[in-house]
Amino acid sequence: YGVTTGGALVLVALLLIFFYLLYVVKPIFNGASMESTASFTLPIKGKTAWLGVEEQNEIGYRFSDLGKVKFFAVQPDGKIKTGQVIGEAQVNGEITAVAPPAPGQKLIAYGFADGKAQVVQPYFKISYPNDVRVIEPSLQYPFGETPVVIDPQGKALTRMVFEATKDKMATAAVTED
């Protein structure tokens, strides 16, 4: 009886392994699905030029075509609700063109009425006061806070695109003339 019982238990173990593998592999063949977990509106004027979240998926940001930047909570915290604005910034100057970032890039460029352009990126400073992680959103200017001259004649930029690396930037722009 011992050999028969042992053989039966081996078959049961093989069946259990088979069903476990089927349970693990079956979701691969299901169709993709997506569902909304939260929805909120932000009180920002202008069209959205760029919308994104920081790497921890806790703070989102929205750059408008008018140069207004709002940082908002994506996940609720003890004191902060989802969608609550937690920081604001403004790109200074009379904005006439916006170049949204290329895929995988974290930079946006604004063109101004005086033929200059400025590259901006969201920056998140992390600190640990009293052993609590705090993320402070702000703007960073990787090519300096002084706008770069694109059109030496000072004509307003109406359309522009750009590509940037760590220390170089290439820009193509159309002026109003």
Task: Give a label for each model feature.
Residues 1-13, 17-177:
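WD40-repeat beta-propeller superdomains and closely related acidic/aromatic-rich repeat-like regions
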